[in-house]
Amino acid sequence: MARRFSAPYQSEPVSSLATWSRNLAIFAVVAVVVSILIVRFGFLEMKPALATFFGALGCAVLSILVGLAAFAAIWQNGSRGMGRILLAFLINAILLAYPAYLALQYRKLPPIHDITTDPIDPPRFEALARLRSGEGANSAVYAGLYSAEQQRIAYPDIETVELEVPPQRAYEVTLALVTKRKWLVIDERPPQLPRRIGRIEAVARTPIMGFREDISIRITPDGEESRVDIRSSSRYFESDLGSNAARVAKLIEDINSAVDNAKPAQKKPQAPAKAPAKTVKK
């Protein structure tokens, strides 16, 4: 092994397999970045964009296999290139870590893409329905009873939000949270007489790939109080890997917190002053 750091070793040729392993890893990174840009900016339809992405992951796997072959060759003939192999392995590990995590999530979570607080009467996609016309896009119609049952098992805490505020106030709080999240609002209708039903339709993007996921929110009166129902659905793919459930659960939490924080602090009633004790003169 000492020979590998000696002067004669430095004159040895670099393994071509090691060079190929490194170059494939670099190409995979470039292809992944290009595929993300294609999806985010809509340069191509979804299928070509995904083909680019999975092709990049395939290059990363091929880079690992070539790197292993290069390692065996270097061990046998003493050529150089270990640094290139290690660089390729590092790049590939970073590149494949998140897809590997998503693969595990795919096995753990139910294959559903449409989450709602009210499976019996989910908020409808009206303005958003026109945006679901691309090839491979999911239907704007709710996924149905199978999805509802899978949701009930996997995410039992996702339920209608009941608020002790009027519908107009619930609408304002919800719209402010949607705006704060930088979701693209497609349509908004505040509660109006006689039915006093408010609606918000918006589009969110997944953090890395920027896949579009559609959200419809309905605010309905409940006497002097209000109920908020939320629906979040992936525009593409049969499984959302839990992203819609996480979005709905977080929005529910933030709506409740915003309404609770806006309530005036209730002052504790002061106890009446006690009358001075009577003294009996003796």
Label the model's feature ranges:
Residues 39-42, 72, 76-79, 84, ...:
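Ser/Thr-rich, low-complexity intrinsically disordered terminal regions
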Residues 10-13, 67, 108, 154:
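Preference for short coil/turn "hinge" residues that link or interrupt alpha-helices
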